[in-house]
């Protein structure tokens, strides 16, 4: 006979005994025995009686470690398979719900508190923010509009008068000084530029178009009429010329 133990199970730990899915009893674990290739569970029931049970027909659940040991050689009973799957792979529904609520979904009051504190400012802070950041107080808006976008009316009037519309006396002065010369300057200009003074006109006409009479006479006398001494050859020169051209000089 060989005595041995389940791994990591100590004596007197609380166990449940199942046979083909049916609950058979609860007791305290003592040890295991192996006799001629057969294994037996040695345990004590709730009445204190010591019992040997063949492990081939039972499965044992260690209560305090939540481990189930199926010692059958062929197939685990379906209820133990279900129990194992539920306890290992799938949490009981109440634990699943608790987990989902505590881990994935905050309780509604915490969600609300979070939303209010993190995502949504309290209404008074929202209002304060909107007023201080996004919307200026109305008096500041008015002041801003008046000082930035719209000049006070007296400044607008002053600007329009001084920038866009010249005062009438400046307009008149400008027109008179730039576009229209004063009449005396116009007259002077016309007289001095377009029409020469009469004495200059006369002088010009006399000096350019008509020579003075003495120059005309002198010119006519000097150009059209040879001086008397040049117009009439001396008689002795004429006679000499005629003799030299017309007379036979005796040369044959």
From Swiss-Prot:
Sequence repeats lie at residues 68-82, 83-97, 98-112, 113-127, 128-142, 143-157, 158-172, 173-187, 188-202, 203-217, 218-230, 231-239, 240-246. Keywords: Plasmid, Repeat. Residues 68-246 are annotated as: 13 X 15 AA tandem repeats. Induction: Transcribed starting in early sporulation and into later stages; not expressed during vegetative growth. Second gene in the orf1-orf2-cry2Aa (cryB1) operon. Encoded on an unnamed 225 kb plasmid. A protein probably derived from this gene is found in cuboidal crystalline inclusions, but is not toxic even when coexpressed with upstream ORF1. The protein runs anomalously as a 50 kDa band in gels. This is Uncharacterized 29.1 kDa protein in cryB1 5'region. It comes from Bacillus thuringiensis subsp. kurstaki.
């Amino acid at each position: 006979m060989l005595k041995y133990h389940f791994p990591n199970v100590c004596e007197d730990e609380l166990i449940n005994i199942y046979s083909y899915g049916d609950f058979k009893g609860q007791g305290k674990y003592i040890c295991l025995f192996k006799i001629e290739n057969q294994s037996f569970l040695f345990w004590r029931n709730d009445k204190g009686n010591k019992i040997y049970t063949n492990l081939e027909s039972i499965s044992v659940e260690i209560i305090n470690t939540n481990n189930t040991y199926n010692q059958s050689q062929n197939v685990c009973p379906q209820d133990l398979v279900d129990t194992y799957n539920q306890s290992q792979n799938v949490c009981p529904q109440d634990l699943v719900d608790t987990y989902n609520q505590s881990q994935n979904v905050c309780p509604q009051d915490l969600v609300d508190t979070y939303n209010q504190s993190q995502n949504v400012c309290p209404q008074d802070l929202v209002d304060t923010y909107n007023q201080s950041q996004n919307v200026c107080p109305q008096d500041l808006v008015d002041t801003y509009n008046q000082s930035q976008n719209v000049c006070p009316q007296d400044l607008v009037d002053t600007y329009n008068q001084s920038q866009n519309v010249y005062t009438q006396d400046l307009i008149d002065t400008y027109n008179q000084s730039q576009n229209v010369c004063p009449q005396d300057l116009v007259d002077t200009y016309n007289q001095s530029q377009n029409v020469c003074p009469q004495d200059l006109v006369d002088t010009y006409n006399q000096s350019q178009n008509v020579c003075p009479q003495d120059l005309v006479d002198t010119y006519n006398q000097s150009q059209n009429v040879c001086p008397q001494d040049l117009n009439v050859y001396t008689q002795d020169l004429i006679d000499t010329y005629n003799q030299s051209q017309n007379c036979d000089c005796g040369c044959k």
